[in-house]
């Protein structure tokens, strides 16, 4: 299992559209992702790894079994919007695409998709576009 913290703690945003556009660039983005594994002997979830520094503001994470990565879309104060590929076993960043500080890199509750040739089909708040990798 993989979970993200995408609830802004200090900001009360009553309008979903305003929230999805402002959390990150204007309002402080929430951070934190964690991978769990089911322990069949204890019948309970066990944490495999956590990353308190990773932002996943609204886009649905995607797991790639072929690359052994989980992909998240978030906002970084220095670089702006990005997609990070985290190693499924360790949580280490293995892949990163930086979009910059405009909202074109805001996935706004969409799904991260990689094409068969490895290019990213990014479903942005401003519409889908292809990122050649």
Which residues fall in each region the model found?
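Loop/turn-rich, solvent-exposed surfaces of beta-rich toroidal or solenoidal domains
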Residues: 1-98, 102
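Blade-level signature of beta-propeller repeat domains, shared across WD40, Kelch, NHL, RCC1
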Residues: 104-133
């Amino acid at each position: 299992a993989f979970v993200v913290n995408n609830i802004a703690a200090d900001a009360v945003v009553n309008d979903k559209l305003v929230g999805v556009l402002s959390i990150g660039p204007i309002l402080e983005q929430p951070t934190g992702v964690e991978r769990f594994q089911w322990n069949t002997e204890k019948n309970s979830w066990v944490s495999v790894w956590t990353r308190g520094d990773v932002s996943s503001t609204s886009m649905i994470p995607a797991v790639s079994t072929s690359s052994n990565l989980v992909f998240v879309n978030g906002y970084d104060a220095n670089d702006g919007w990005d997609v990070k590929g985290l190693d499924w076993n360790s949580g280490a960043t293995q892949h990163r695409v930086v979009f910059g500080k405009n909202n074109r890199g805001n996935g706004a509750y969409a799904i991260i998709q990689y094409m068969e040739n490895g290019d990213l089909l990014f479903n942005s708040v401003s519409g889908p576009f292809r990122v050649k990798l």
